[in-house]
């Protein structure tokens, strides 16, 4: 789908970022800018800044921000197209999809909207059947016995599908919906012999399943009798794919941002009861192992994931598998281990809400430590297992982002393996060296943008690269005068290299530079962060004679000895502050520099 650029520009020009952000954040004027508490993470000291002049916002804590479109995408967790439409409605501008959208794709979009409409219409019918009919009394009593109050049932829009094969079928038919489309939406089943349609869900308690925008896209029907299966979910449809659905994400999103943590539970019933008990940042996958799409959703919201699965064997195995997948993706992973045989509902019913919340807060441990404890018996009694788990643990420690947490883990894990902490640290350093020299650690190949904020000492070359890009963003004439004298490959900083490439594209379509407009050309959040940092980098308004030429010459010469000396200094500084990400990055650069000198 494509929206005409002139429409995008008109919407952006008519949307004042100060007015927009003020709907979500209480702002106070500080000098030329406005500042408030960040809406994307929990903080006590305001670090979220809005520039009315530049029409951008930026959080100096979590680094999120951008122009009006990027702010809307982040605050509402929607796509760029959806953000444009949303802001278009705000300023009374009609947003039409471009001509490249075919009639076929238009029909698909229309059908998907009708599928969602069907799900949301039948929801009210199901709810009425549960709360107001004799046939729904047994199901309602079952819910009451399980601790579901009428208020909770209403809040979660829970319903009942009667034991009638045409309850949903007849309702949708009377409303004028295509029965074939209702089948494709997963609300009906079909007899393949005579092609007759009947209700998929019968005699089940109905739990609506919503997408990230809060629209109902499927159902989970739970039996309250001996009927099998215990849970019957909607099939895979154009609007419902399990790999893309996290139950309760639409409701939990604001709490996840506030707490800077997401708690992943085993099932949606666990989520409902935990949320009702006061644990708000909870979600669950729909009976499937965590997909890459799920992990991507999580990474957009927070870097901290806590797993709280059932306290049985299957729950522990699922914790090991899921935790490893999350750790491998660079997330900070923690575990709350429920007592044997218990799920969250069991714990809440045995104790109370307050004790449950206290337990979750106090029993949290690093996934790496949980994993070692799970294999402690093998470690103590099997030499082969000891060596295998020792190597795995060292690798897992290399993935822990926080130096403080990693050092604490080393102390605890050393006791389990019955070695000195120095032994683990030695093996960990060797692992870093191997990963860097063999280029087997792709996660940290790009330069961490925060290195300029943490480590103040820049090399001569780094200063030149940053100053050059800053000058090239001042106006189009400056860019055109110098862009042919240097190529992206001359830059050592990967972010500045990419910004230089984007500037060429930007100036080919724009005569004047504004950071708000430039944001439209950049999809990477990290790159936007660097662009904002660069915007705050102060230079003289007018470069002195040959200043830009000097920067280009420095970049092309790239003094290796000066770079190596500075890199060693930065490696020591990164080690001192316990930042493993920076250690790995600078170690990689040192290895590469030494290779080039040989």
Swiss-Prot record:
Classification via SMART domains: TOPRIM, ZnF_CHCC
All copies of domain Toprim, residue ranges: 260-341
A Pfam match: DnaG_cat_HB
Gene3D superfamilies per the UniProt record, alphabetical: 3.40.1360.10, DNA primase, catalytic core, N-terminal domain, DNAb Helicase, Chain A, DnaG, RNA polymerase domain, helical bundle, Zinc finger, CHC2-type domain
Cofactors: Zn(2+); Mg(2+)
Cofactor note text: Binds 1 zinc ion per monomer.
Transmembrane spans: none
Alphabetical GO biological process terms: DNA replication, synthesis of primer
One GO cellular component, as annotated: DNA-directed RNA polymerase complex
Zinc finger (CHC2-type): 38-62
Subunit and interaction comment: Monomer. Interacts with DnaB.
HAMAP family for the chain: DNA_primase_DnaG
Protein's name in the database: DNA primase
Name of the coding gene: dnaG
């Amino acid at each position: 789908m494509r929206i005409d650029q002139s429409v995008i520009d008109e919407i952006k020009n008519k949307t004042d970022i100060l007015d927009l952000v003020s709907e979500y954040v209480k702002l106070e004027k500080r000098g030329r800018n406005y500042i408030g508490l960040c809406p994307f993470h929990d903080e006590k000291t305001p670090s979220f800044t809005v520039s009315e002049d530049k029409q951008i916002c930026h959080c100096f804590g979590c680094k999120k921000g951008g122009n009006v479109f990027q702010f809307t995408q982040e605050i509402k967790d929607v796509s760029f197209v959806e953000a444009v439409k949303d802001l278009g409605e705000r300023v009374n501008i009609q947003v039409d999809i471009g001509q490249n959208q075919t009639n076929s794709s238009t029909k698909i979009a229309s059908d998907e909207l009708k599928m969602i409409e069907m799900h949301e219409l039948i929801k009210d019918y199901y709810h009425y059947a549960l709360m107001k009919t004799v046939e729904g009394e047994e199901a309602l009593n079952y819910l009451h016995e399980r601790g579901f109050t009428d208020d909770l049932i209403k809040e979660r829009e829970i319903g009942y599908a009667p034991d009638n094969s045409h309850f949903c079928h007849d309702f949708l038919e009377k409303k004028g919906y295509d029965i074939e489309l209702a089948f494709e939406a997963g609300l009906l089943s079909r007899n393949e012999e005579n092609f007759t349609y009947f209700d998929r869900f019968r005699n089940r308690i109905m739990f609506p399943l919503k997408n990230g925008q809060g629209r109902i896209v499927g159902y989970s029907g739970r039996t309250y009798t001996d009927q099998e299966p215990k849970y019957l979910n909607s099939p895979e449809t154009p609007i419902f794919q399990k790999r893309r659905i996290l139950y309760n994400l639409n409701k939990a999103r604001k709490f996840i941002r506030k707490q800077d943590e997401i708690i992943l539970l085993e099932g949606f019933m666990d989520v409902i009861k935990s949320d009702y008990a006061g644990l708000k940042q909870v979600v669950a996958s729909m009976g499937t192992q965590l997909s890459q799409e799920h992990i991507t959703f999580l990474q957009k919201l927070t870097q901290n994931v806590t797993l709280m699965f059932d306290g049985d064997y299957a729950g522990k195995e699922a914790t090991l598998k899921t935790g490893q997948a999350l750790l491998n993706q660079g997330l900070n992973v923690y575990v709350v281990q429920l007592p044997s045989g218990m799920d969250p509902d069991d714990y809440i019913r045995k104790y109370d809400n307050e004790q449950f919340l206290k337990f979750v807060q106090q029993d949290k441990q690093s996934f790496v430590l949980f994993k070692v404890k799970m294999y402690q018996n093998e470690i103590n009694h099997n030499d082969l297992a000891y060596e295998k788990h020792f190597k795995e643990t060292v690798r897992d420690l290399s993935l822990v982002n926080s130096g403080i947490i990693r050092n604490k883990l080393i102390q605890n894990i050393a006791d389990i393996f019955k070695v000195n902490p120095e032994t683990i640290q030695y093996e960990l350093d060797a692992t870093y060296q191997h990963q860097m020299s063999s280029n087997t650690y792709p996660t940290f190949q790009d330069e961490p943008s925060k290195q300029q904020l943490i480590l103040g000492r820049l090399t001569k070359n780094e200063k030149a690269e940053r100053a050059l890009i800053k000058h090239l963003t001042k106006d189009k004439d400056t860019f055109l005068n110098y862009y042919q004298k240097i190529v992206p490959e001359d830059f050592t900083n990967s972010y500045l290299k990419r910004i230089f490439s984007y500037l060429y594209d930007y100036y080919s379509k724009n005569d004047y530079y504004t950071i708000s407009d430039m944001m439209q050309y950049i999809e990477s959040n990290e790159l936007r962060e660097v662009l904002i940092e660069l915007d705050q980098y102060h230079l003289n308004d007018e470069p002195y004679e040959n200043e830009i030429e000097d920067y280009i010459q420095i970049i092309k010469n790239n003094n290796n000895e000066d770079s190596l000396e500075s890199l060693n200094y930065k490696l020591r500084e990164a080690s001192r502050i316990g930042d493993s990400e920076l250690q790995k990055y600078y170690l990689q650069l040192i290895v590469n520099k030494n290779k080039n000198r040989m």
